């Protein structure tokens, strides 16, 4: 029953975002739209931003289910684009009403989860420090999120598949190469530029 109520609150928020900006939506608005009292809202979420964060995490979990490997990262990234596009009014409203920072935080979490799986898989059999693996995942995270924020900024125009294909051409094989350069079980070579 708890998940059902949370999903109903999420849907009410998304319905209201079609009518007005996030900063003008109140908990009473959401509760009224959902047909519950305000205290029920507070039983599940501390505020509207907590609901926004939960909604983003739920969408992320659905988007990335089973797509955190080197062979499927493109599908995972495409699923992220599709999840963002499917929630365009929600994302655009949060992007313009609250702050770009909240959208960035959502996207950073989403893409890091995807990339962490890819880096771990590619690091199999290599002796690479955890902080170096995290650094590599973060570098790619910033590239991915930068591309996506640019796409959002331009009203989600452009084909996500084309963006992903171009990105793949740039970074293909580079995760394994970066991990190899960070190996602690072999001497460092001159990485060049």
Predicted regions, residues:
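Amphipathic, non-transmembrane alpha-helical scaffold segments
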Residues: 2, 6, 56, 104-108, ...
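An amphipathic alpha-helix adjacent to DNA-recognition modules
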Residues: 3-6, 10-14, 18, 23-27, ...
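Cytosolic nucleotide-binding catalytic cores of signal-transduction proteins
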Residues: 19-20, 127, 193
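Amphipathic alpha-helical packing segments from all-alpha helical-bundle domains
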Residues: 100-125, 131-146, 176
